[in-house]
């Protein structure tokens, strides 16, 4: 199943770039045409790059990594907070503080301070050893820290990769990530520099729906990675992770074989009537052969019954 469809990209306006006078010539290879003074991004390439980024994020999280979501522009703030919270990843959707990655040890001290302030009951003036004025100042400090660091309060180390909406606006985050050699996944609008992004997704980084769709795709990749990390299936119809897929199929076949044997024991051979139907398909006959090879003893009672 496709990660995202062409129709979804079109409906969200992912193909709209900036005006032709506002562009980066390095983006020429991602632009399909120009219409009414606006560049149209090639969505066929976008689909391919989305699949590539999706696979990278999923693999990174499956190996125990974290993805930081970054988007401080108005169009991205809600989607960044919502999707990152959904999958339990750190995010920055207000102001990017200088050194948030390159000077993380200092930032982590401020995070610890925020956690300390969260434990204080600011409404219990009588039971506190502090004055009302001191509590008010501490409440303001807590609110200020929560606004800038609330999204990364559970982050204990620098992330394995960062998802960035609008690399031009978030140039500080891009610079810090590149300095630390942290992979960058980002939306590339027609005015962006593709050389700064490791896993680019050509698309519109200004429309709320486009930003929301692409951020949700990244969050879905994180969710699949978390499922793979815990070894749990994504659900009916979802693909198993890597080499575990055949194992899961054989487990289902073996479970089916055990259920059939139980039916034979209970009804005295009634379940054998389904054998011709099972043999009518190649997959079922192959599974039956494997079950027969794996459990030769289970066929003996049926043979005795026929005799």
From Swiss-Prot:
GO biological process: one example: translation
Pfam family for this entry, one: Ribosomal_S2
UniProt keyword annotations, A-Z: Ribonucleoprotein, Ribosomal protein
Similarity field: Belongs to the universal ribosomal protein uS2 family.
Disordered: annotated span: 256-307
Gene Ontology CC annotation, any one: cytosolic small ribosomal subunit
GO MF, one annotated term: structural constituent of ribosome
Keyword Ribosomal protein attached: yes
Comp. bias intervals (Low complexity): 259-307
InterPro entries in the cross-refs: Ribosomal_uS2, Ribosomal_uS2_bac/mit/plastid, Ribosomal_uS2_CS, Ribosomal_uS2_flav_dom_sf
Name listed for the protein in its UniProt record: Small ribosomal subunit protein uS2
Gene: rpsB
NCBIfam families associated with the record: rpsB_bact
Keyword Ribosomal protein set for record: yes
CDD domains reported in the protein's UniProt record: RPS2
PROSITE patterns: RIBOSOMAL_S2_1
